[in-house]
């Protein structure tokens, strides 16, 4: 396992124990970076207006389309570190 992957997995664990709950925009960014790092570009249709949470998550993830997994992992690590 690469050093980046190990640091990413540690950041994922650390994200569950942050001193304060991040605001919704930051939570969406955390979600999107995690999904981009672990699954790649978003796939499937954008959720409809009745699923506001799903739609916001999809939009955040879609905003990272084309970002490499390594870049998304590093951005995720940096974001979690800044929230500690």
Predicted regions, residues:
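A charge-rich, low-complexity, intrinsically flexible signal that marks solvent-exposed coils, linkers
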Residues: 1-84
């Amino acid at each position: 396992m690469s050093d980046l992957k190990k640091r990413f997995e540690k950041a994922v664990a650390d994200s569950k124990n942050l001193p304060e709950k991040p605001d919704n925009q930051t939570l969406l960014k955390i979600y999107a970076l995690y999904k981009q790092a672990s699954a790649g570009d978003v796939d499937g249709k954008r959720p409809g207006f009745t699923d506001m949470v799903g739609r916001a998550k999809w939009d955040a993830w879609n905003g990272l389309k084309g970002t490499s997994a390594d870049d998304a992992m590093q951005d995720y690590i940096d974001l979690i570190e800044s929230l500690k």
